[in-house]
Amino acid sequence: MDPNEKGIEVLSFIDEQAECSGSDSEEGYEESQSDLSDLIDNTECEQGNSAELFAQQEALAVQEHIRASKRKLKLSFRNPLQCITSHSNRTPSRAAPKRRKLDDSGYNEDILGEVAQVDENGGSEGYGSLGSQNVSGRVQVCNVNAANKENDLCGSFLRAGSRRATQLAIFKDKFNISFNSLTRPFKNDKTCCNNWVGAMFGARDELLEASKMLLQRHCDYLMLLMHTCKLGFMALYLLEFKHAKSRETIRHLFQQILQIEKEEMFLEPPKLKSLPAATFWWKISHSASAYIYGELPDWIARQTSLSHQRQDDQPFDLSQMVQWAYDHNYTDEPTIAYNYARMASEDSNAAAFLRCNSQVKFVKECAQMTKYYKTAEMREMSMGKWIKRALDEISGTGDWKDIINFLKYQGINFLSFLASFKDLLHGIPKRNCLVIVGPPNTGKSMFVMSLMKALKGRVLSFVNSKSHFWLQPLNAAKIAVLDDATKATWSYIDTYLRNGLDGTPVSLDMKHRAPIQICFPPLLITTNVQVMKDPLYMYLHSRLMCFEFPNPFPLNEAGQPALILNELSWKSFFARLWRQLDLSDAEDAEDGEPPSPFRCCARSADRHL
């Protein structure tokens, strides 16, 4: 083809195309302008699903974090509002609703149930509105913090349990016996006990050596055995304290001495009745590496020594108990039971008494037998021997002049009183009753009661006169006192007791026994009735020795008695006027051989009383 023709065709083609697209270009321009005018839309735009997509993505991230944590520890989150939702959907019941204790999770807690409810399997339920998505991150952070706190708490428990298990394993490895096999647990740290077992870990060697000396002032027995372990030095203590102590007190004591924490020590009381435990302590006490201070505790010796075992097998002997009560002058049943039980740790027969099932029976029999012996011994004694023995039991000294000054103050001739008092002590017929007459507050009762305490007499009370046995104490008395006799008392005496005041034998009714024949002991009576001036009691005038106290008892400026009338005053009085009262039996006893002590059981001479 000719090149000129080819160029013409190209130009014609361009011209044709330009003419055809002219109108289209104008319409396209107009349309492009309309599109550009709508490029910026100022109308309110709807959110759509972008926020929900973001919340789902965040929830998935938290869910992955939770699953990663649950692979290590099986934890389940608590949803405190899930219970509220379930309760709100229920139909109301007739019963009144109860107040429930709900956990408070802070601001906007109600959105927690809508945002992310995590069940035990780790799944999540639906999401709420746009407002809930704004706080979803905060709620998720709170859940993660709660999980971390629970993980830390569980970890601390695991570490503490692991430490204790490690220490117990080390103890068992070193001594071939578990710590719990040697001790009995005390749940309360304030429970006191004399014997304690201690296992200490991690203390320094020099402090353990120093504890040997520092603990001696607190203990009657101390045993220390030291070993080395992977935790450092381990020490085993067996302690018998002088006084009962609690775990808290002993813990503070070891913290000061060994400078260790309470987690590094075990403190429990030993098993006192376990033969394997006692054998273990007895065996290691003979070890060359053990430090011993004091004598072996009785609870170990009792189970490991043949002599102690024979003593434990010894049956109860009532005669030894009676001998003990007689030597200590115990005749009251509660006193005998209490004091003999206290001797169980020292006396084998007392320990056997505690093992008996008939303790009440034995106590009654012991008290009754002691009374029999004491009464028979009293009847064999003369008045002089009895007074001498009673005054020897009074410790201290008094002034006999107080009694003489008091009699002079009341206007009584001392020589006349001394003669009557001598006849009273010797039981002269018709001179066997001394009466003190006077108005109130003159010292009558103080005068006779102090004499009664000094001579260990008995007291009669007319309030018991309706009973046939109100005079029964006269059977076991060397002297008796009837205080504040009224007209009814004198009428009774005038009717029934004339022979008794004479000092002749009378028949005395005894409880649970047949009437016995006795002579009334010397009798002191105080009264406000002028019995010697009343003709109604004329038959008693010859049987009574009467002295009148007309003056009130003297007092000092402080309101205290100016004259001291007590058992010490009477002790000095009898010592001063012993010969004048013709109480010479004590002097005769000093010239002869001393009487042998009473024995009601076959016992050795060196036996403990």
Curated annotation (Swiss-Prot):
Gene3D superfamilies: 3.40.1310.10, P-loop containing nucleotide triphosphate hydrolases (3.40.50.300), Zinc finger, large T-antigen D1 domain (1.10.10.510). Keywords: ATP-binding, DNA replication, DNA-binding, Early protein, Helicase, Host nucleus, Hydrolase, Isomerase, Nucleotide-binding, Phosphoprotein. Its EC number is 5.6.2.4. Phosphorylated. GO terms for cellular component: host cell nucleus. InterPro entries: Helicase_SF3_DNA-vir (IPR014015), P-loop_NTPase (IPR027417), PPV_DNA_helicase_E1_C (IPR001177), PPV_DNA_helicase_E1_N (IPR014000), PPV_E1_DBD (IPR046832), PPV_E1_DBD_sf (IPR046935), Rep_E1_papillomaV (IPR016393), Znf_lg_T-Ag_D1_dom_sf (IPR037102). ATP binds at residues 438-445. The modification Phosphoserine is found at residue 76. It is found in: Host nucleus. Residues 398-562 form the SF3 helicase domain. GO terms for biological process: DNA replication. Residues 146-313 are annotated as: DNA-binding region. Can form hexamers. Interacts with E2 protein; this interaction increases E1 DNA binding specificity. Interacts with host DNA polymerase subunit POLA2. Interacts with host single stranded DNA-binding protein RPA1. Interacts with host TOP1; this interaction stimulates the enzymatic activity of TOP1. ATP-dependent DNA 3'-5' helicase required for initiation of viral DNA replication. It forms a complex with the viral E2 protein. The E1-E2 complex binds to the replication origin which contains binding sites for both proteins. During the initial step, a dimer of E1 interacts with a dimer of protein E2 leading to a complex that binds the viral origin of replication with high specificity. Then, a second dimer of E1 displaces the E2 dimer in an ATP-dependent manner to form the E1 tetramer. HAMAP family: PPV_E1. Belongs to the papillomaviridae E1 protein family. This is Replication protein E1. It comes from Bos taurus papillomavirus 6 (Bovine papillomavirus 6).
